[in-house]
A protein has these predicted regions:
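A structural motif detector for short, solvent-exposed N-terminal "entry" segments of globular domains
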Residues: 4-69, 118-127, 135-136, 140-151
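A broad, low-specificity signal marking well-ordered, structured residues that form hydrophobic/aromatic
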Residues: 26, 64, 79, 93, ...
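Residue-level detector of flexible, active-site-proximal loop/helix-junction positions
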Residues: 35, 73, 85, 100, ...
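The feature marks short-to-medium sequence segments in extracytoplasmic or secretory-pathway proteins
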Residues: 55-89
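Short, surface-exposed beta-strand/loop "edge" segments at domain boundaries and coil↔beta transitions
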Residues: 73-75, 103, 137-141
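Intrinsically disordered, low-complexity Pro/Gly/Ser/Thr-rich segments with frequent PxxP/GP/PP motifs
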Residues: 76-116
Length: 151
């Protein structure tokens, strides 16, 4: 076992003993990066990202950001969450690429429908990476999707 692995294991074991939990349990659940059919402007809202609060605590997303591929260090497209958005346990947020009116739907689970207000697609059809940052710029989660081509 390497030193780095042993150190990581020690910290993990310590966290379980002390019942230390990560500050956020917001995950990027899904990226609908390649809606069926041609990429035409009336399909912008069929391209979306889904976040979910897997934790027990309500989390405010005010000032949080969602970006596409950050592997180059440059955030090409950045969505900033409005001050009014928070997710209770198991609630979801759908961030649609196109224009529209933001809304909240009660249900099981309840969900936000948020709109990036873009007039062109964000997520690459071949695949892309979505990264979520909190208001202080700390990386919260990241999800990469790849489109497999039939041979």
């Amino acid at each position: 076992m390497s030193t780095a692995l042993a150190h990581s294991t020690l910290i993990s074991d310590f966290s379980e003993i002390c019942d230390v939990k990560p500050p956020y349990r917001i995950i990027i659940e899904h990226i609908n990066h390649n809606p069926h059919g041609k990429d035409v402007s009336d399909k912008l809202n069929e391209e979306f990202v889904v976040l979910e609060n897997e934790g027990a605590e309500k989390i405010s997303l005010a000032g949080w950001t969602l970006t596409d591929d950050t592997t180059t260090g440059v955030r090409r497209h950045v969505y900033t969450f409005p001050q009014t958005v928070s997710l209770s346990s198991r609630e979801k947020a759908y961030i649609h690429t196109g224009p529209g009116e933001d809304s909240f739907e009660e249900g099981k689970p309840s969900k936000w429908n948020l709109h990036w207000e873009r007039h062109s697609f964000v997520w690459n059809n071949e695949g892309d990476t979505a990264t979520l940052f909190d208001a202080e710029g700390n990386k919260v989660d990241s999800l990469q999707v790849v489109t497999l081509k039939a041979t």
